[in-house]
Swiss-Prot record:
GTP binds at residues 225-230, 244-250, 269-272. NCBIfam families: mnmE_trmE_thdF, PRK05291.1-3, small_GTP. InterPro entries: G_TrmE (IPR031168), GTP-bd (IPR006073), GTP-bd_TrmE_N (IPR018948), GTPase_MnmE (IPR004520), MnmE_dom2 (IPR027368), MnmE_helical (IPR025867), P-loop_NTPase (IPR027417), Small_GTP-bd (IPR005225). Transmembrane segments: none annotated. It holds the Pfam family TrmE_N. Its EC number is 3.6.-.-. It is found in: Cytoplasm. Binds 1 potassium ion per subunit. K(+) binds at residues 225, 244, 246, 249. This is tRNA modification GTPase MnmE. It comes from Rickettsia conorii (strain ATCC VR-613 / Malish 7). Mg(2+) binds at residues 229, 250.
């Protein structure tokens, strides 16, 4: 196995920059850079590092050596903590590249080596990636749970039950002359029923984990000049959309990213929707606005208090569902009695974006819907489309299983189900079945 290195921290000015080295030559490389031979594992040392060929000083650093297998990758690992300087990073990188037998790591290669050395399964590796990319508290909670092995435990439990079923079926087929009780098939049937129901229910999760991981799309919809761009700017706390009294100013979809109550929200300001427009570009913007609303997870539909009749057109009303927040904007410009019927009919919030009236209620409603759609629970969710694909395949094989069919074919359905679950965690080894057979039965008794 080659020895690899990379700067683990971001390149640029910082208090500290961290370099990681992993592989059989890690300790030798550290000795070359420092001129010191005696390094104990898991102790931090204050050292000077120099260019091995010229002995030019690179930096005064802190270094630590992790002896295999007690490291992140399971290999010998060295970490070098330098000052966070671009010049130091370049000098150390060049010095390492000039040492024989060491190369720059590929993206994700340290984590890949950790997986190959059985430090964790594929779901935990994906959890680490999600943890690095997490931008909100709820994303962090989901990622840390996955990285700590909660998903692995769930899938391994299902796979263990499948292997038990498989061992019982294999024994029933391969050892017909042995004294195997008929209750074996009853146990298989009961486990099969439980797993079908459990996995079916697990898949029927409204993609909560995936929504939390990728972010919930929120589209702001309404007629022209109703205040959509002003609302977007308020939510983003900065001007990212042009605000104008001229109808049709927003022609395309404008996006912004927001953290509301710990949930990642992808805001989309859209072109104003009106029934007639002679402008070809605006027509395309309206078409995109409607499509954006149809694919959005959450919608804010805005009505103009001064122009309620023109605000409420069929295209907009048809977009309302249980995840829609309807608001009447510009309430400061009209008497409350004039909007009462519409307010009640569509359960609208009464706000004034311009004068910052009742805008906190919009944030609270967004948070409530986000929590309902992607709220964190103790049961681990599916967080990745890869997992969902394999689980759907597993359920398909599991559903096809029937003891009324050929027993060999039925056994193959269970085998394929176990392989699909194993593919999620990265553990696929049908030889485990043999161990299950001898563990559960005394063959030749």
């Amino acid at each position: 196995m080659e020895t690899i290195f990379a700067q683990s921290s971001a390149f640029g000015k910082a208090g500290v920059a961290v370099f990681r080295i992993s592989g059989p030559k890690s300790l030798e490389v550290l000795q070359l850079l420092t001129g010191r031979k005696d390094f104990k594992s898991r102790l931090m040392y204050y050292q000077q590092i120099t260019v091995p060929e010229t002995k030019e000083l690179i930096d005064n650093v802190m270094v630590v050596y992790f002896k295999s297998p007690g490291s992140f990758t399971g290999e010998d690992v060295v970490e070098i903590h330098t000052h966070g300087s671009k010049a130091i990073s370049i000098m150390l990188t060049n010095a390492l590249l000039n040492i024989a037998g060491i190369r720059l790591a590929e993206a994700g290669e340290f984590t890949k080596r950790a997986f190959l050395n059985n430090k964790f399964d594929l779901t935990a590796a994906e959890g680490i990636a999600d943890l690095i990319n997490a931008e909100t508290i709820m994303q962090h909670k989901q990622a840390i749970r996955q990285a700590s092995g909660k998903l692995e435990a769930l899938y391994n439990n299902w796979r263990s039950q499948l292997l038990k079923m498989l061992s019982l079926l294999e024994a029933y087929i391969d050892f017909p002359d042995e004294d195997i009780p008929d209750t074996v098939l009853n146990e298989v049937t009961n486990t099969h029923t439980i797993l079908v129901n459990t996995i079916s229910e697990y898949l029927n999760d409204n993609r909560k984990g995936e929504l939390l991981r990728s972010g919930l799309k929120l589209a702001i919809i309404g007629p022209p000049n109703v205040g959509k761009s002003s609302l977007l700017n308020f939510l983003m706390q900065r001007d990212i959309a042009i605000v104008s009294n001229i109808a049709g100013t927003t022609r395309d979809i404008i996006e912004g990213h927001l953290d509301i109550g710990g949930y990642p929200i992808i805001l989309q300001d859209t072109a104003g929707i009106r029934e007639e427009s002679s402008d070809i570009i605006e027509q395309e913007g309206i078409k995109r606005a409607i499509n954006s609303a149809k694919t959005a997870d959450i919608k804010i539909i805005m009505f103009d208090a001064e122009k309620l009749d023109s605000s409420i057109n069929e295209d907009i009303i048809n977009l309302i569902d249980e995840n829609t927040i309807t608001i009447i904007n510009k309430i400061d410009l009209i008497e409350a009695s004039k909007i009462f019927s519409i307010e009640n009919k569509y359960k609208c919030l009464r706000v004034s974006v311009k004068n910052n009236i009742a805008l906190s209620s919009i944030l609270k409603n967004i948070e409530n819907i986000a929590e309902n759609m992607a709220g964190f629970t103790e049961t681990p969710y599916i967080t990745n489309q890869r997992h969902r694909n394999y689980l759907q395949q597993a359920l398909s094989h599991l559903t096809a299983f029937s003891l009324d069919n050929d027993l060999v074919l039925a056994t193959e359905d269970i085998r394929m189900t176990a392989r699909c679950i194993g593919a999620i965690t990265g553990v696929i080894n049908v030889e485990e079945i043999l161990g299950e057979i001898f563990k559960n039965f005394c063959i030749g008794k």
